[in-house]
C-alpha cells in the first residue's frame, strides 16, 4: 500500500497491482486501489487466475482494468472480456459499490447508458 501511495504522489498515471505473483490479500488490494481515488493514477489489477469472482471483486473495488494470466486461445480471451462487461454483453453483475459509484457518479444513469450502448452494438 505504501508503494502505491508513493507512486501516486510521484505522478504515476497507472499502477499495476500484481495478485498473480504478489501476496496481496483483499484488504490490501482495497487499500491500494483506494489510494488512487481522486488522482490521475489508474489502478490495474493482475488477477491470480481467470476467476470470475476475483475479477468482479477487483472491478467493484475500483480497478480501472484487469490483466488476465495465461490466456492462450480466442475463446479464453472472449471469456475474460465477458467477465468484465455488464449484461447483455457480459456476465458482470451490478452493485452500487465504490468502484461503480466512482465517488459521485449517478450510477443508475451510467449503468442504463452502458446497457443501451452494449445492446446497440450487439
Roles of regions detected by a PLM:
Residues 10-14, 60-65, 85-86:
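Glycine-enriched alpha-helix->loop->beta-strand junction motifs that scaffold or abut catalytic
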Residues 53, 65-122:
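Conserved anion-binding
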Residues 24-60, 82-89, 113-116:
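Alpha-helix-loop-beta-strand connector modules within alpha/beta enzyme cores
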Residues 2-4, 108-109:
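Short beta-strand/turn micro-motifs at beta-sheet edges
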Amino acid at each position: 500500500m505504501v508503494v502505491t501511495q508513493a507512486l501516486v504522489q510521484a505522478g504515476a498515471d497507472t499502477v499495476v497491482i500484481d495478485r498473480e505473483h504478489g501476496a496481496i490479500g483483499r484488504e490490501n488490494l482495497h487499500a491500494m486501489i483506494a489510494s488512487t481515488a481522486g488522482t490521475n493514477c489508474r489502478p490495474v489489477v493482475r488477477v491470480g487466475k481467470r476467476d470470475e469472482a476475483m475479477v468482479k471483486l477487483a472491478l467493484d473495488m475500483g480497478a480501472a482494468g484487469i490483466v488476465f494470466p495465461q490466456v492462450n486461445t480466442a475463446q479464453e480471451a472472449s471469456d475474460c472480456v465477458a467477465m468484465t462487461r455488464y449484461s447483455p454483453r457480459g456476465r458482470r453483475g451490478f452493485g452500487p459499490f465504490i468502484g461503480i459509484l466512482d465517488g459521485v457518479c449517478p450510477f443508475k444513469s451510467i449503468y442504463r447508458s452502458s446497457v443501451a450502448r452494449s445492446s446497440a452494438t450487439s
